[in-house]
Amino acid sequence: MKINKIKIQNIKSNAWKFWALLLLLFSSIFSANAQDTIKVQNHIIDNQIQNQIFKYPVVYTNSNIKDFTFTEVSYEHQQNEFARKQVANEINTYQFLAQGYFTTKSRWKLFGDLAIKKILEKNLGWVLSDDRAIEQEVINPHYFYVPRKADWDNQVYALSGGFSKDITNHLSVAVKANYGTEKFSRTLDARSQITNRNLGGEMQIGYQITKNQKAFILGSYAENQKDFTFKYNNSNLNLEVYPETYLRFNAGYGRILNSFKSSGSGYLYQDIVDKIGLGYTIKGKNSIFTALYYAQNSNNIFYTSDLDLKVNERMKIKTKSNHAELFAFHKWNKKEIQSTLQFDQSDAKNFDKQSNGYNYTNSLNKISWTASLAQKSDSKIDYLVGLNLLYQQNEYDDVLSTTHIELNSLNTGIYTSKDFAFNKSKLNATASFNMYFPLPSKLDYYDTSGGTNIRFFDEVIIYDYAVNTTNYFEPELRLQYSYPTKNNKTVVFFTNLKEKIAVKKQTDYPVSINTNTTYWVQMGVQLNY
């Protein structure tokens, strides 16, 4: 049955009206008084304000933010039972994370992040790229695959940082840069090896309209390059008589091609991403309100060589995205409230130079809202309650396979947290409960390959559709014990436990999926100051 689709243009129109109403509502509580110091904790209680400080530093050039440094070493085990097909059965992650924010005597604000990860995946099939269907409903096309499952050994290094400063009484600037490198290696035929290099930068310029109002613009550019190679220790396994290991290429979502030889020593993916946007913020002594919008373009090119020459171009996929965001923060007495409302919309379309046409498109729409109310006594959390909502309306279409999917869903959640203080130390308990509701969705498929592509449809497309249209419950519990040491440093020992429990399958397709509980366990130590 075809669903009645919500008109996105109406959502956009209503969102802008809502922004104007919120701005009018909050304007009465903003004054030109000096703003109180913002103290950020390494805890879910400050996730929203922390995210704003690092994403849009130009907004906070004249804010008093207490210096902080967070470091973490942790281990995470993820056992995937109820999950999409292109996800490893087991994932073990060892990671080191660091984050810092400092203000110099001359009022330069410096900030940065560092992440080092070792990721071991067990039993991953149907994809030879570095993309995974953990957060994505559908992996972007243009990747090699074999059905056979194998283990992966992966390394991730990511570094980002920047600065911000008021240049004059009216002009402020913020500059961010990021660099990352990744290596993914599969341990069985077909043995793929992937090396990623990411480099990007962003500039934000603000103009102080009045003492408590600022307008700003932002622009960014990033270039991501991915080298892909594969080899067989037993070359006979790359023959059509061995379907488990015979190399295929997914040119859409169901349009499957036989693999093609490289004209060099491997293959290359190049992704160019640019972004431009604008925003407005108003601040009071105890309040912040920010509204912003940006548009982003991505052009991802697949080359049948390791050289990025025009003659080697084979596939392209272009994505146009729009993002709108509202953030509000207010505190009074010992209480504070934070709220983030976001709207994301994107359209993607691929192009095959050899056939001189396209076959794959997607249209993704998302509205998310997170809000929290907390009471603090110095660094002690008396209580925290919050909620989050995520509505998604996504459409995927491959005109040559032929596959058409409409996925609609609502994810709702609540969370709470509290500190239990002792003489010097404290114990924090945080619990969250999320529920995923699939809304009326649709899957149409007609096999135009004469049966050669039917296995991908049966084992990936239908299977994932059944997972995406199954209700699930996701509870999480986090415990952390904090103990202060010398020089205002705090050592934190923590553990997380999260489960994903399938509740009810909605699809009528005759497919059997694994509904055993998926779970995550994480433990680690932090040094915060």
Q: Which role fits each region the language model picked out?
A:
Residues 87-95, 150-168, 174, 194, ...:
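Outer-membrane beta-barrel transmembrane strands
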Residues 65-71, 106-112, 169-173, 211-215, ...:
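Outer-envelope beta-barrel architecture signal
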Residues 98-102, 159-165, 201-207, 276-284, ...:
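Residues on the lipid-exposed face of transmembrane beta-strands in outer-membrane beta-barrel proteins
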Residues 249-391:
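Long, internal scaffold/assembly segments composed of regular secondary structure
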Residues 71-77, 112-118, 175-181, 217-223, ...:
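Transmembrane beta-barrel strands of outer-membrane/channel proteins
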Residues 37-38, 211, 516-529:
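Outer-membrane beta-barrel "beta-signal"
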Residues 81-88, 123-129, 184-192, 228-234, ...:
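Outer-membrane beta-barrel translocator domains and adjoining extracellular loop/strand segments
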